[in-house]
Curated annotation (Swiss-Prot):
This is Achaete-scute homolog 3. InterPro entries: bHLH_dom, E-box_TF_Regulators, HLH_DNA-bd_sf. It holds the Pfam family HLH. The keyword Phosphoprotein does not apply. One of its GO terms (cellular component) is nucleus. Residues 92-144 form the bHLH domain.
């Protein structure tokens, strides 16, 4: 059985015109059973003027004070930090921002094109994506390092057999 206690309902429920003139036990806007919908544009009824001086001007403030978030969602809202929209900025600002982004993308793409030109011709058979270009460059750099320093390439393959004497003197800890 339900062990929660509920407030007892009044003996008589009045739904007619006289209900507007009944004395209230507490202000109606503090009663959790009453849903208040305020419209700031409409004038306040004269019969409740003595009970309304504590009401805030904005219905959003009333909702925030009594119930928390005015629009509770059952899931978290993504990107809550992005409250600024494009329409808050002028068209000149947006054009400049877009131009800066185009320039940035152009520079990045030129960098990848230059990197592709330095790769061996084996990699140039097909168009490489940015990730494939970076992976090919890493492989090619390690291949070139193994040609320059054959001892270090053996050390990388077998790290346990490396001796302290094979380290670069600048990297050796004294």
């Amino acid at each position: 059985m339900d062990t929660r206690s509920y407030p007892s309902p009044p003996d008589r429920l009045s739904v007619f015109a006289e209900s507007a003139h009944l004395p209230l036990s507490r202000p109606f806007y503090l009663d959790p059973m009453v849903t208040v919908h305020l419209c700031p544009e409409t004038p306040v009824p004269a019969s409740y003027t003595d009970e309304l001086p504590l009401l805030p001007f904005s219905s959003d403030t009333l909702i925030m004070n009594n119930y928390g978030d005015p629009y509770p969602f059952p899931f978290p809202m993504p990107y809550t930090n992005y409250r600024r929209c494009d329409y808050t900025y002028g068209p000149a600002f947006i054009r400049k921002r877009n131009e800066r982004e185009r320039q940035r993308v152009k520079c990045v793409n030129e960098g990848y094109a230059r990197l592709r030109r330095h790769l061996p011709e084996d990699y140039l058979e097909k168009r490489l994506s940015k990730v494939e270009t970076l992976r090919a460059a890493i492989k090619y750099i390690s291949y070139l390092q193994s040609l320059l320093y054959p001892d270090e390439s053996e050390t990388k393959k077998n790290p346990r057999t490396a001796s302290c004497g094979s380290l670069d003197p600048a990297l050796r800890v004294i």
